[in-house]
């Protein structure tokens, strides 16, 4: 039963109604390695989970040509927009994976592949009965430990205070991650501002930035 469900999810994950040279294809039998992500091997690799319209990664890719950027996004309209932007800027260091990362993550990539992973504004699922649907949980932290090397960085942002506090508690309990300077930041300069983030700021919402370094595998 579990195996049948997993096969069905893989089938859904690989069912993209259009093609592009910027797509990566996930496989249930072979993990993606740095050698088969791009036409060349980059110095470092950056993974954005839920890349939306792609503006954050594209802005960073323009500034960091020696880093390969992998974007995981499941919504087709956002993927199409991102592809147009990649083509507009003639970027050779951005690829897209149309896979729901809440289904498959460490199953897709080889260990220690990414030096940085970004998760911006995931659904906070505010109702208590929906908390189990939240992306960041103890299992997710184990996935981060697999994908990041020691000293690898994880960037997280939310505009929902209770979610931020829960994430902080999870990291405290993990012991594998350490804040770079402080547990919670009100500003972040390393990552460009997304459309969603700008909108929330204009609405007067407080943004919670939680960045961590993997210190123990």
UniProtKB/Swiss-Prot annotation:
PROSITE patterns the UniProt entry points to: SAM_MT_TRMB (PS51625)
Top-rank taxon: Bacteria
InterPro entries tied to this protein: SAM-dependent_MTases_sf, tRNA_(Gua-N-7)_MeTrfase_Trmb, tRNA_methyltr_TrmB_bact
EC code: 2.1.1.33
Sorted UniProt keywords: Methyltransferase, S-adenosyl-L-methionine, Transferase, tRNA processing
Task of the protein: Catalyzes the formation of N(7)-methylguanine at position 46 (m7G46) in tRNA.
Protein's recorded name: tRNA (guanine-N(7)-)-methyltransferase
């Amino acid at each position: 039963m579990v195996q049948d469900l997993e096969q069905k999810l893989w089938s859904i994950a690989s069912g993209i109604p259009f093609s592009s040279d910027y797509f990566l294809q996930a496989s249930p039998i072979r993990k993606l390695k740095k050698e088969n992500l791009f036409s060349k091997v980059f110095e470092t690799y950056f993974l954005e989970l839920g890349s939306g319209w792609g503006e954050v990664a594209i802005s960073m890719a323009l500034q960091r040509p020696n880093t390969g950027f992998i974007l995981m996004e499941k919504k087709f309209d956002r993927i199409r927009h991102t592809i147009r932007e990649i083509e507009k800027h003639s970027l050779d260091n951005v690829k897209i994976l149309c896979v729901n990362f809440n289904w498959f993550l460490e199953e897709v990539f080889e260990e220690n592949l990414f030096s940085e992973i970004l998760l911006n504004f995931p659904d906070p699922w505010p109702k208590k009965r929906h908390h189990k649907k939240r992306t960041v949980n103890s299992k997710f932290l184990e996935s981060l430990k697999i994908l990041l090397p020691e000293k690898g960085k994880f960037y997280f942002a939310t505009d929902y205070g209770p979610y931020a506090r829960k994430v902080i508690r999870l990291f405290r309990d993990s012991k594998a991650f350490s804040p770079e300077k402080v547990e919670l930041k009100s500003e972040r300069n390393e990552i460009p501002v997304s459309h969603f983030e700008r909108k929330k700021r204009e609405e007067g919402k407080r943004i919670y930035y939680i960045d961590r370094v993997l210190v123990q595998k």
